[in-house]
UniProtKB/Swiss-Prot annotation:
This is NADH-quinone oxidoreductase subunit C. NDH-1 is composed of 14 different subunits. Subunits NuoB, C, D, E, F, and G constitute the peripheral sector of the complex. GO terms for cellular component: plasma membrane. Belongs to the complex I 30 kDa subunit family. GO terms for molecular function: NADH dehydrogenase (ubiquinone) activity; NADH:ubiquinone reductase (non-electrogenic) activity; quinone binding. It catalyses: a quinone + NADH + 5 H(+)(in) = a quinol + NAD(+) + 4 H(+)(out). Keywords: Cell membrane, Membrane, NAD, Quinone, Translocase, Transport. It is found in: Cell membrane. PANTHER family: NADH DEHYDROGENASE [UBIQUINONE] IRON-SULFUR PROTEIN 3, MITOCHONDRIAL, NADH DEHYDROGENASE UBIQUINONE IRON-SULFUR PROTEIN 3. It is a peripheral membrane protein.
Amino acid sequence: MTGGEQKPNEIIGVRRGLFGVRGSGDTSGYGGLVQPISLPVSSNRPYGGYFDQVVDRLESVLAEQENVTYADAVEGVVVYRDQLTIHVKAEHLVQVAQSLRDDPQLRFELSLGVSGVHYPDDSARELHAVYPLMSITWNRRIMLEVAVPESDPHIPSLNAVYPTTDWHERETYDFFGIIFDDHPALTRIQMPDDWDGHPQRKDYPLGGVPVEYHGATIAPPDQRRSYN
């Protein structure tokens, strides 16, 4: 599937060293990596294949509703590596998801879960939640993506629209700290209830304990030598 011309990615920062380590604690033995951090930007029309049909129909469905328009709800549309991602404002996520599920020409009946992503350099949009959706009726797949700041990490839960997201939203809350408002039981699902922090954020400390081996003591990862 091919679409229109892809715009250059947006550079949001520079990665230095491996494993996302910042400042110190690089335990790789090599800290000379310098790599731009980039995110895809909105794609040009035509998107290709059924992508245009999905976006056009969603725009029409939202236009028929009283309290929201397509321009209000959708921040952008990205086609990257033959995948369609619709970026939605958090306050309109439930309405967009319900439109995608219920409209006969869209019929995205199934959510395959939700994944969290942490972009520390994406200012005021550091935490992203990505929902893969599938239309069994039309054999189509798209993704919804929402971005919120670390300072206010609230996203409406999609549990009422897609019950399959129940435990996935709990896991995303557990590991990334995204708070899914109106979730029926938003508690940690893998870490202990009293655990401090969210382990899959890129600024989460590596931690560890000293390890003794052949008479030598190896320091925890956070305290080892940096090779920069």
